[in-house]
Amino acid sequence: MGGPEGRFHFAIDRGGTFTDVFAQCPGGHVRVLKLLSEDPANYVDAPTEGIRRILEQEGGVLLPRDRPLDTSRIASIRMGTTVATNALLERQGERVALLVTRGFRDLLHVGTQARADLFDLAVPMPETLYEEVLEVDERVVLYRGEPGAGTPVKGCTGDLLEVQQPVDLGGLRGKLEGLLSRGIRSLAVVLMHSYTWAQHEQQVGALARELGFTHVSLSSEAMPMVRIVPRGHTACADAYLTPTIQRYVQGFRRGFQGQLKDVQVLFMRSDGGLAPMDSFSGSRAVLSGPAGGVVGYSATTYRVEGGQPVIGFDMGGTSTDVSRYAGEFEHVFEASTAGVTLQAPQLDINTVAAGGGSRLFFRSGLFVVGPESAGAHPGPACYRKGGPVTVTDANLVLGRLLPASFPCIFGPGEDQPLSPEASRKALEAVATEVNSFLTNGPCPASPLSLEEVAMGFVRVANEAMCRPIRALTQARGHDPSAHVLACFGGAGGQHACAIARALGMDTVHIHRHSGLLSALGLALADVVHEAQEPCSLPYAPETFAQLDQRLGRLEEQCVEALRAQGFPRSQISTESFLHLRYQGTDCALMVSAHQHPASARSPRAGDFGAAFVERYMREFGFIIPERPVVVDDVRVRGTGSSSLRLEDVPKAHSGPPRVDKMTQCYFEGGYQETPVYLLGELGCGHKLQGPCLIIDSNSTILVEPGCQAEVTETGDIRISVGAETASVVGTQLDPIHLSIFSHRFMSIAEQMGRILQRTAISTNIKERLDFSCALFGPDGGLVSNAPHIPVHLGAMQETVQFQIQQLGADLHPGDVLLSNHPSAGGSHLPDLTVITPVFWPGQTRPVFYVASRGHHADIGGITPGSMPPHSTSLQQEGAVFLSFKLVHGGVFQEEAVTEALRAPGKIPGCSGTRNLHDNLSDLRAQVAANQKGIQLVGELIGQYGLDVVQAYMGHIQANAELAVRDMLRAFGTARQARGLPLEVSAEDHMDDGSPIRLRVQINMSQGSAVFDFSGSGPEVFGNLNAPRAITLSALIYCLRCLVGRDIPLNQGCLAPVRVVIPKGSILDPSPDAAVVGGNVLTSQRVVDVILGAFGACAASQGCMNNVTLGNAHMGYYETVAGGAGAGPGWHGRSGVHSHMTNTRITDPEILESRYPVILRRFELRLGSGGRGRFRGGDGIIRELLFREEALLSVLTERRAFQPYGLMGGEPGARGLNLLIRKDGRTVNLGGKTSVPVYPGDVFCLHTPGGGGYGDPEDPAPLPGSPLQPLAFPERGSVYEYRRAQEAV
């Protein structure tokens, strides 16, 4: 932040609530200022007002607000702003039209086809950023040299392409003129394969600008990376947000003389670099505000702490941002914000819905914090505006916040202090619920004081914030205890010591400007210019010269751009990156070679191969040396170094620190006399023993008992965190510890999953994340499970309990079991479950179990992939394991398991496993994941004791049971109030006519129910048979949906339920029955029947639409979305997966680049949703044109029986599978078949619609469809990982 001497340098963080101003004044001293971001009664623009006030204070001359400010004394202004974020959240951007290749009209509506919330029956409609769609007549495909193909063109990646249809500019002109006449001035242009061949997009863009469109965002310019869906979302976001940002910038400039012509004005981008205001664009601005904080602690805490890795902890009002810095910024290149996926470099900032304004609830015996927030208005109860009780209120009740340290800006007139009385009153209402449960609940206990309740909520909030930090560190091979916790933001100081203790950290660093660290980060940030282009080259010696040439060209672009901004070459540095992956995988890593100098076997820019292997090994625990490495993208990041040096270091104070006052703070042992210090009066070397409070105008720091704070030579606060005092926890139920154990148990399952994903080698487990990890009690009952893959929810406990019954005393330390048999709780054979019994000193039987279930891509059988559409016996579907000791006496039984995996080859027409190497590697990874779970539970037992941990395993199951009993009673009460019986029933049919019948009898006094499937059809000669475990999984899924809120998903969900399934039926077939279709099809019908009996919603598409394509050198499998059923108060979502699956679909550009197909159409099947007062969602039309001979297999349902409507709603349309031969002949394939296809043939899949709800003729006004929530409670790589896990 350099510039002429004697002038001001401003760094401004314009947040959603407050604007922070950091100014380096002439002479080097610093002024800081905090003001409201919105105060229209007093000023138009907060950053301008902040600058005016500081100029006025420093100059001693009144500067009227209604006159532009003189810029002669201003050298630079740097700003981070939430303008783009707020426009995205509030959907207040520009009116936009999307121009997309014909056949892909609804591509961005469908997106990945996965739903965001697995258990929300009212699947929210995606609120797309565009207002209209124009389909562009053009088509470019990858060149394969087929007969009749035209002359190929070469893309910038090096790929050859074929222009099958030039862009029809004449036909497009009239359509664009129509858009202009309707007032639309901003366009997003998204054409297939434009990442490598952009000419069509450029032609469309030129025409649009010629016609007068004011902003045109080309996807090939917004982010030239393969995958049209995220690239299209990015282009739309750019078109939607950039005009808004430009208007804000222009308005800001008008507040200054000469419109800032002679002032360097820079804006913070999402990647942590500054950009000139004229090139500040919407898709790069969404994390502009939070990015400043990361830069701030990277430039301060990391340096001061001697290069020790740092976890950034920024706790605000509605959420907490968590990030990591260990010498270089950690970027992600795709993340979702406010329901929009952006493909652009962004700092990996993980946001969790736990902030000062997070609301507090007591639900079914569990303390719950968030994700709902009080927001800025009305705010927490203590704001005196009738708001709900929040984390801030809990801290105020505990004495950890002092009302006197806050300005009097609260209440309706915004002139009153914080109100502890309002906090106590609001919390007392929750405490009454808590104590009613404690005295009248299943385990009567002594009531809690108001302070104990407040303390409980604070502890639960702390544990919620620890989970993403563990995921951000341990999941990537880092030890959280080896980090420093850098705390900033208004609310973080009250929680920092507790967070650090829980994670084993011994140091908390709080910068003296922690309340304005994002503004400070802007002052310290570098100016960045990036250049990137896609690539399609192998990383091999023969391509190194090309890679050097490309990197050199991009480096020149970056250097020239920074020189144009006034940086001399001596202040410019560049860093080169390659986006690398192993061939045949999707897991690409953006790697820099700055720590790996060039060698004889590398490009001149550095040894990227060594960097890739090193990082791959660190993140995943293995490498794949036999596979070639591929370059997806080349990137150069140019940096113009900031020259700011802070000179406002506080002077040392002589004498002991002065206590400003004494107050009473509540801790675990009760109230303690707590001294209060003013930060401004503390000097270098002052040491403060906890407990104490350190106050300044922007934050409150709580130093807990057993901790010691010291003022460093730079004026910061470094807290040495003492070991946590061992708390005595009994086996009796304590709701506070129940909530904490709930988080700990879930964290164990999540970390098991991270180890499995890191160490597995197959695409299914490593990239598609098709696995579950779980923790079980001593009786085999499920305690916690992550992720929540619906078809695994109830099945894994059946598997564990079968092994307990089967082996009993024949389980010994060092044993690990393998099972997949349907009779032993298996779902289908490719899902292999690895179970480890855990022994403890002094115990003769296992004290708990851990297990991991992963979908293996092939375990033999009659077809590749082990999912044949026409199997009639279990043996045809692959290798079978009933109760197999995978590890015996600590030794992995490789020879025996290899023999078992090859055994299907002895059956006529079958093959053994076709990928033994991946099977063995993934089984070892599952064993390693289980071992991690054992270690983590061992740590828990070491902290609390075996009896306490086992007791809380039981308590957490009882909590889930209570939530289900409450739901069943509420359902029964509602029926009684309407004079209806307590018995409900439903019936539906599979396409072969097999009935699925259900009768549910509610017992009101017990809050229980009998689910009786008697009358369901017999076992079928085919593969639609569903093992008993499938029905239990479907039932747990439905119960969770009916409860309608977050509850622990475990064995307790089924405790209030007795399930009757007739032996020998389609829902409990004989041990040798084929079952692969039961897992993917019958499970959906079971869900439809259960939800139909409860009247919860109409039937969804009831199918996963399984499509397989393969030949001697290629295999592809996908499931395709359809319509969701409507319900009481919502329309069904169109083009989405429902219920027992949530699989993401392959991006069209990836599909066409890796497989011999052209995707001709992928759009909604308009009108296929059932009519009703609330309409069912529409299905999908998907057309694949084949470019090679192959075998096409379809395994589908709802081709004969329509998805039902409810309450007078009409059914959704049946699905349809058509094959259009090259000669024009059309064949209906039916629901289940395998058929050879040839070049020129087209498969046309029409997926079913969802049923309607309510009378279509009902004249009542239709409410709007549920939309994506306008807040983004969670964001970042941890959130994306969990979302991906739940999308399988």
From Swiss-Prot:
The modification Phosphothreonine is found at residue 151. Its EC number is 3.5.2.9. Its main location: cytoplasm. GO terms for cellular component: cytosol. It catalyses: 5-oxo-L-proline + ATP + 2 H2O = L-glutamate + ADP + phosphate + H(+). Catalyzes the cleavage of 5-oxo-L-proline to form L-glutamate coupled to the hydrolysis of ATP to ADP and inorganic phosphate. Belongs to the oxoprolinase family. This is 5-oxoprolinase. The lineage of its organism: Eukaryota, Metazoa, Chordata, Craniata, Vertebrata.
